[in-house]
Amino acid sequence: PSPTRRSKSRSKSRSRSRSASAGKAAKRAKSKTAK
């Protein structure tokens, strides 16, 4: 169960970083359209 738990935490951090990058891209696009 320890290895599966480790993979779970890894996928969690990966999804979190992905969502953060998506939010950044959305913010950039918003500022571009506003400009």
UniProtKB/Swiss-Prot annotation:
One of its GO terms (biological process) is cell differentiation. Keywords: Chromosome, Developmental protein, Differentiation, DNA-binding, Nucleosome core, Nucleus, Spermatogenesis. Residues 1-17, 25-35 have a biased composition (Basic residues). Disulfide bonds: none annotated. Sperm. It is found in: Nucleus; Chromosome. It comes from the Eukaryota. One of its GO terms (molecular function) is DNA binding. Residues 1-35 are annotated as: Disordered. One of its GO terms (cellular component) is nucleosome. Involved in nuclear basic protein transition: histones are replaced by spermatid specific proteins which are themselves replaced by protamines in late spermatids. This is Sperm-specific protein Phi-1.
